[in-house]
């Protein structure tokens, strides 16, 4: 019974997240950033209408009004959710030093055509996985049919 209740909550969170991301057909349109429905130290990057979960650096929480990770006193997040205590990842040399939310940076995965990276606001590569059967297409910056993505593993 506990497993069923957990599964229902997990599915409800996934549906909530999917409903929150607006459809994005224009690749030039800036990404939509949203608060995570249950974790204050996470946020959603809407990638062509699909929510991608990202984590704030340790000690910071998502500030939805500023659309960035912030100190807990400024973030005004719901109580009861503890911040991330993992050590902060190091910025990647592949990510630009200045974050521009209007121009997301996507990096193809080095060995897996079904994966890619998004550069977060702190210059860290966040690994993402395409839906089953699709490959990352760096020309259009979204998951695409393998014959169109032309990636060779």
Swiss-Prot record:
Phenotype upon changing residue 28 to K: In strain: L3-5
Phenotype upon changing residue 73 to S: In strain: Yaounde Yd21, Yaounde Yd35, Yaounde Yd41
Impact when changing residue 89 to S: In strain: 4aRR, PEST
Single GO molecular function: chitin binding
Tissues of expression: Adult peritrophic membrane.
Disulfide bonds: 56-69, 130-143
Protein name (database record): Peritrophin-1
Organism: Anopheles gambiae
């Amino acid at each position: 019974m506990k497993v069923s209740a957990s599964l229902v909550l997990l599915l409800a969170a996934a549906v909530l997240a999917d409903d929150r991301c607006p459809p994005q057909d224009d690749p030039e349109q800036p990404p939509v950033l949203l608060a995570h429905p249950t974790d204050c130290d996470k946020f959603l990057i809407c990638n062509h209408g699909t929510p991608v979960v990202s984590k704030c650096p340790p000690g910071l929480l998502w500030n939805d009004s500023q659309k960035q990770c912030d100190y807990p006193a400024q973030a005004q997040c719901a109580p009861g959710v503890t911040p991330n205590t993992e050590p902060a990842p190091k910025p990647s040399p592949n990510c630009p030093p200045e974050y521009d939310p209007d121009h997301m940076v996507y990096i193809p995965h080095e060995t897996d055509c079904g994966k890619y990276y998004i550069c977060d606001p702190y210059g860290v590569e966040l690994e993402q996985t395409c839906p089953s059967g699709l490959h990352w297409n760096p020309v259009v910056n979204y998951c695409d049919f393998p014959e169109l993505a032309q990636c060779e593993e």
